[in-house]
Amino acid sequence: MSATGQPDNAIQMGFKPMLPGFDYAEYNNLEDFKSKVTENTIAIMIEPVQGEGGVHPATQEFIEGLRKLCDEKDMLLLFDEVQTGWGRTGAPMAYTGYGVKPDAVSMAKAVGGGMPLAACCATEKVAKAFTAGTHGSTYGGHCVTCAAGLASVTEILDNNLS
């Protein structure tokens, strides 16, 4: 909730104080993102397609620029695909249409086929930080939700629904 691009909104009500250290930049504005990067910046997290208040896809130039910036500054590029993942944009993940690989991607909603399920996929380098006992999930590993997730993803992939 600290990372939401809509600070001080209803999503955060009742949950303060938020974690410090988050900064926000204008979507699709690479120069604004660059201006916010400091020696303490470790990652940039965005939605490849923003879904609140309409449908707002990132430009190709913006996504490619973020990947280049993160590579140059040794930062992680994180994609939030909770709204757009698993076929909701006509591709398995919205980011796949950009030809840019994130360091990690979060997904939910469609991945569970209506059941409460979420996932985080990461590169091997990033995944090494997730050691046993350091990352938890409310619904992690539940047999019913995992079966629903497997069925949902299988249906999407086997029937070319993305």
State where each predicted segment sits.
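Conserved N-terminal phosphate-binding loop of PLP-dependent enzymes in the Aspartate aminotransferase
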Residues: 1-162
